[in-house]
Amino acid sequence: MTESHIDFRRAKFLISAPDIAHLDQYLPGDVGVEIAFAGRSNAGKSSALNALTEQKNLARTSKTPGRTQLINVFELDAQRRLVDLPGYGFAQVPLAMKLKWQQSLGEYLQKRACLSGVVVLMDIRHPLKDLDMQMIEWAVASEIPVLALLTKSDKLAQSAKMKTVNEVRKALVEFGDWVQVEPFSALKGTGKPKVLSILNEWCHPQWLADELENQEDAE
C-alpha cells in the first residue's frame, strides 16, 4: 500500500473515557490505528498535541499539572485516532489515583491491539524519570514503537539541547530501533516535521493495509 500523507490538522475530538474498559465500550472495536501520547503531568503533552495538529484548543492545556485524568481520543479519519493518555507522576495527586492511572496506562499499552506507536513526552530538562522508563519498557515489551519526545527544547541553548538528546539516545540504546529520540518545541515548532513524519509512518502499519484489503474482498 502506498503511504498517503495524513493531515493531522483534521484531528477532531471523538470521546473521553475514564479507563481502558470504558474505551473499549465507546470505540468501534479494537480496529484501525491508534497512536498514544503519554507523559508526566508537566511534560507539555497538551501543548504538543495542539502544535502538531495546528489547533489551539484540541487538547485542553492547564497550568495545574494532573488535570487531564481521562483518556481523550481524537479522530484523524475513519481508521486512525490519536489518544491522549492521562498525565502521570504529579506529586499532589492522591496515591490511590496515581495507582489507578498507572494500571489504566499499563492495560492500554498491553491490551490494545490497534496501538501502532507511543509518543512518550518528557521535559528536556528532566528526562527519563522512573515512570517514563516504565512506559517505554511496557511499550517495547508489547512490540510497540516509541518516540521519546523531548519537549520544551526552546528552554535550552543549542549545545545543551543536543547534549541532552545524545545522552537520552545513549540511555535508550538497549531498545534498538524500537525507540527514537527527538527534541521538540511546541512554542517554536522545532522538530515538528520530523515528528509528523514518524506519526505518518505509524499511521500506515501493514495490519491496516490487510484490514482494508479484507474489507474490499468482503464487499
Curated annotation (Swiss-Prot):
Q: Per the record, what is one GO cellular component?
A: cytosol
Q: GTP-binding among the record's keywords?
A: yes
Q: Where is the EngB-type G domain?
A: 31-205
Keyword Metal-binding present in the record's keywords: the answer is yes
The protein's superkingdom reads Bacteria
Query: Which InterPro entries does the annotation name?
Result: G_ENGB_dom, GTP-bd, GTP-bd_ribosome_bio_YsxC, P-loop_NTPase
**GO molecular function (one):** metal ion binding
**Which positions does UniProt annotate for GTP binding?**
39-46, 66-70, 84-87, 151-154, 184-186
Q: What SUPFAM superfamilies does the entry give? A: P-loop containing nucleoside triphosphate hydrolases
The protein's matches in Pfam families, at most eight in alphabetical order, are given as:
MMR_HSR1 (PF01926)
Which residues bind Mg(2+) per the record? 46, 68
Q: For this UniProt entry, which segments traverse the membrane?
A: none
Q: Which cofactor does it need?
A: Mg(2+)
Per its UniProt record, what CDD domains does this chain match? YihA_EngB (cd01876)
Q: Name one GO biological process term.
A: division septum assembly
Q: Which UniProt keywords apply?
A: Cell cycle, Cell division, GTP-binding, Magnesium, Metal-binding, Nucleotide-binding, Septation
- Which NCBIfam families does the protein's record reference? GTPase_YsxC
* Family indicated by similarity: Belongs to the TRAFAC class TrmE-Era-EngA-EngB-Septin-like GTPase superfamily. EngB GTPase family.
Q: What does this protein do?
A: Necessary for normal cell division and for the maintenance of normal septation.
- Under what name is this protein listed? Probable GTP-binding protein EngB
What is the gene called?
Answer: engB
